[in-house]
Design a protein with these regions (language model features):
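Fe-S-dependent hydro-lyases/dehydratases of central metabolism
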Residues: 1-390
């Protein structure tokens, strides 16, 4: 299972609530990573992927059970079809030639020899859904971050992965990105995956928190249990809607946002869009019990302020429910103590202000400079312009 499914097969999975799985030779085995309807993914060598494809199921012992029968009804086992080292070496010798690589890669560096050198300025195409002029120096991203009166976009638990933050699986029609691509005239069979559209922010920003396995603690059933899915609750109205629709509401209001999370926020693949997506959504700060190292760096690079709760303090001890307004005050410096100011209404209708000490997770002076510039691209632009003036 990879990429788009046959619509009939996909509908069968939905109608029968099947526990569909994927077997792959890559390393992306997060829930829903290969496809939103693949509830689990198993990693295997390429020959094993072929063997499981022949069997059509994982509900058997591949070492002892048969994969199927031959034309005479005799059972066929894995050992019967498993290639020997000699067979593999012979195929590689026939199919892989050094000349293949020389023919492709050597001319790549002979610029202007075989064809006219291209202009260094890219001719942006407004209808492209694969590469588009990035918005990182204009609009909302050019405005100062106030870190004041922020609304929570999501309150999340532990072990939030970059795949929760910005999935890379196949785009389905009823997703926000799928609906956008359809409006752009792209047929469903050509939607491809989120990862292939990472050069187009209008497609990929709609993937922010689009993972169907997400648990946003702001979205609950009447019995108090958390609903699973790409959902958000817009405040102060308290209306629950699809995550992207909530982001659009807040973008139209120019409402600064914050994310509250548990331990190990941002683990998994070092995906740049996990940081880009939340910044484009208007998130100015993320307060968590802990950050994965690379993702924390990516947040700084996008101008999002990572803040860490002190030991013994978290979203549960503070009884956060998403109705609050958040502000951050203090001197931003490497690992300095800042104050998270939480304003909320009490049960008797009064306004309560809670001040919580948090650690600024800008860990070096250079990270402070990058953050203050608005991100690594903005810092690069500043240095470039200052260098030209000098």
């Amino acid at each position: 299972m990879s990429g788009a499914l046959d619509p009939k097969i996909q509908q069968e999975i939905i109608d029968r609530d099947l526990y569909a799985t994927a077997v792959l030779s890559g390393n992306r085995n997060f829930d829903g990573r290969i496809h939103p309807y693949a509830k689990q993914a198993f990693l295997a060598s390429p020959p094993l992927v072929v063997a499981y494809a022949i069997a059509g199921t994982i509900r058997f012992d591949i070492e002892t059970d048969s994969l199927g029968n031959d034309k005479d009804g005799n059972p066929i086992y894995l050992k019967d079809i498993w290639p020997s080292d000699e067979e593999i070496d012979a195929l590689v010798k026939v199919a892989v030639k050094p000349e293949q690589f020389r023919k492709i890669y050597i001319p790549m560096f002979d610029l202007g020899v075989n064809e006219k050198a291209a202009s260094p300025l890219y001719d942006w195409r407004p209808q492209s859904t694969y590469i588009r002029r990035p918005p990182y120096w204009e609009g909302a991203l050019a405005a100062p971050r106030t870190l004041a009166n922020m609304r929570p976009l999501a309150i999340l638990g532990d072990n939030i992965t970059t795949d929760h933050l910005s999935p890379s699986n196949a785009i389905v029609l009823d997703s926000a990105s799928g609906e956008y691509l359809a409006k752009m005239g792209v047929p469903e069979e050509d939607f491809n995956s989120y990862a292939t559209h990472r050069g187009d922010h209008l497609t990929t920003q709609r993937a922010t928190f689009a993972n169907p396995k997400l648990f946003n603690e702001m979205v609950r059933r009447t019995d108090g249990t958390i609903k699973q899915g790409s959902k958000a609750r817009v405040e102060p109205e308290g209306e629950v809607m699809r995550m992207w629709e909530a982001i659009e509401v807040y973008m139209n209001r120019k409402q600064p946002l914050i994310i509250i999370a548990g331990k190990d926020y941002g683990q998994g693949s070092s995906r740049d869009w996990a940081a880009k997506g939340v910044r484009l959504a208007g998130v100015e700060a993320i307060v968590a019990e802990g950050f994965e190292r690379i993702h924390r760096t990516n947040l700084v690079g996008m101008g999002v302020l990572p803040l860490e709760f002190k030991a013994g303090v978290d979203r549960k001890t503070l009884e956060l429910d998403g109705t609050e307004l958040y502000s951050v005050i203090g001197n931003i410096a490497p690992r300095s103590d800042l104050t998270l100011v939480i304003e909320r209404a009490t049960e008797d209708g009064k306004n309560e202000v809670v001040e919580v000490a948090v650690t600024c997770r800008l860990d070096t002076e250079e990270e402070v400079h990058v953050y203050e510039a608005g991100g690594v691209l903005q810092r690069f632009a500043q240095d470039f312009l200052e260098g030209n003036v000098a």
